[in-house]
Amino acid sequence: MSDQANQGDLEIRPSPLLTVINDLHSKYKSLKEGIVANYIPELAKVNPDLFSISIVTVDGQVYQVGDYQQLFTIQSISKVFAYGLALEDHGRDYVLTRVGVEPTGEAFNSIILDEQSKRPYNPMVNAGAIATTSLIKGAGATERLNRVLEMFRRYIGHDVFVDISVFTSERSTGHRNRAMAHLMLNFGMIDRNLEEALDLYFQQCAVMVNCHDLAVMAATLANRGVNPVTGEQAVNSRYIKDILSVMYTCGMYNFAGEWAYKVGIPAKSGVCGGIMAVVPNQMGIAVFSPPLDIRGNSVRGVKVCEELSQQLGLHLFECVKVENGKWGVGNCEC
């Protein structure tokens, strides 16, 4: 298991930050808390000992340790990027008519909709993500899927593919998601073929990535939508504020408040065991470890991010005095 690897044009160099993540990896690799997601049969087969940490900065430095090349399905982390694509397709005002931006305090698979508006509460829970995905433009199912895959390519810097076995597993067992979609169809929050919208949602969740890919995607968001590897604009910079705001308030499900209090940066988790976090204008962080807590967040991932935030002063409200006598935010030196 290596703590460094050449990845595209990124520069890898010795750093105190590499020491920090190596120490955290060593500290938590023997942790046995949590269970692997089993409500999707294919996910239940994953090795619970897989564990990696990757950090990519906005100027192209990379630090990583563990199984960072291990592929896994992106799952709910895809919701962040589908939301960005829907914003580009329709603009924030229209998207807000279909999905809100309020935290729910409920589990990620809650069927509850806003009582007054009948909208799903936010795009980071399943109901909201299904509504968001249904907004993605295209002449047909194939074009919409190709647009989603092309979107991921811009964020990551290379082509991606859908794991067909996971897609079919989710499709055949996704009765709760199907119930949500029918409820939203009833209230006019979905207005196209329901099964087609669900298929695209299941497909985007089954896109294969690794921990390094997630860190590049997070760094792209930290870099105002510009991929630090390729220099390509992955998403219009005007929507970065929208995306990061919803990640901050809703990205960790019914753990979002405690996450904001302890870690204090925008993040999104997935039942794959991934957590992707964004330090605006500085870096993207990704942790992969399949065992989950009762809220559906990676046990090791949460602990690593909490310690990184504390050690590096990453909390958005962590004010430190800088040389010119003014107050700044964060205390990260890579």
Swiss-Prot record:
Pfam families: Glutaminase. Substrate binds at residues 76, 126, 170, 177, 201, 253, 271. GO terms for molecular function: glutaminase activity. It catalyses: L-glutamine + H2O = L-glutamate + NH4(+). SUPFAM superfamilies: beta-lactamase/transpeptidase-like (SSF56601). It is an enzyme of class 3 (hydrolase). GO terms for biological process: glutamate biosynthetic process; glutamine catabolic process. Its EC number is 3.5.1.2. Gene3D superfamilies: DD-peptidase/beta-lactamase superfamily. Keywords: Hydrolase. InterPro entries: Beta-lactam/transpept-like, Glutaminase. Homotetramer. Belongs to the glutaminase family. This is Glutaminase.
